[in-house]
């Protein structure tokens, strides 16, 4: 099969206060990429009783209004022929790692379970995937918990982003951008998942919170039969993906013909 190599930034986090910038974000993506999974970020910083800043979800009515606005925009873009997927970031209780949840259609609702296993159950039987990112941070501090991993729900992982490389805990590309979440650990890194016997692909993507498609923060390549949502979703399910940190290097590989 002669697959098309399609490019995107699969980790564009848009916040509540940025929703009015969505058309501008899309304009940039449309000029640079072939498809776009966007991840709504339902979290904000608040002060606790001691004055310490903590991250918490926006009020539910705010989130649901934004989700419907994102749905409307995605359907408009899809109708115009551009393959866009809507999604959101899920963090739960911080014990299983952060995952971006994406749906094939535009009809799913956001779920807020505290644990990854319950997130998987919430979308059982539906065309939904959850992609872990910045995996190598500490366990229970938003690093990946391989003990709870589901390779069907999470067919690939984000090995590189603006946070750095989660491949292992001693590679040359460190994770020092957010030191409060570090350091990297061998217990949660990507190599540990392979050592545990899981089968999953890898991507790179930005983890951008101000604009999509930032050079140097990572891009995802998807090898698909065509540039449609159906073909792209099928390719992602089959783990036909890879990632680059900077330039869009084209790679074609086969196993067993």
Regions found by a protein language model. Give the residues of each.
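Extended, charged catalytic domains and RNA/DNA-binding interfaces, predominantly
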Residues: 1-257
């Amino acid at each position: 099969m002669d697959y098309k190599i399609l490019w995107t930034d699969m980790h564009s986090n848009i916040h509540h206060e940025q929703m009015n910038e969505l058309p501008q974000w899309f304009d940039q993506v449309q000029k640079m990429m072939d498809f776009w999974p966007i991840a709504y970020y339902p979290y904000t910083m608040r002060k606790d009783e001691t004055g310490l800043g903590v991250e918490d979800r926006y009020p539910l009515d705010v989130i649901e209004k934004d989700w419907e606005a994102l749905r409307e925009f995605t359907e408009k873009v899809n109708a115009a022929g551009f393959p866009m997927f809507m999604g959101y970031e899920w963090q739960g209780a911080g014990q299983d790692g952060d995952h971006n949840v994406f749906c094939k259609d535009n009809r799913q609702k956001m779920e807020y379970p505290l644990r990854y296993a319950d997130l998987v159950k919430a979308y059982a039987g539906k065309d939904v995937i959850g992609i872990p990112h910045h995996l190598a941070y500490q366990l229970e501090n938003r690093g990946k918990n391989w003990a709870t991993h589901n390779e069907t729900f999470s067919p690939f992982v984000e090995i590189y982003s603006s946070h750095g490389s989660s491949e292992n805990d001693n590679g040359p590309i460190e994770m020092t951008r957010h030191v409060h979440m570090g350091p990297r650990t061998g217990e949660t890194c990507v190599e540990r998942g392979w050592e545990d016997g899981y089968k999953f692909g890898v991507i790179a993507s930005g983890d951008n919170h101000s604009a999509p498609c930032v050079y140097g923060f990572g891009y995802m390549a998807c090898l698909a039969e065509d540039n449609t949502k159906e073909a792209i979703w099928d390719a992602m399910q089959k783990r036909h993906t890879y990632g680059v940190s900077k330039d869009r290097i084209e790679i074609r590989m086969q196993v067993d013909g």
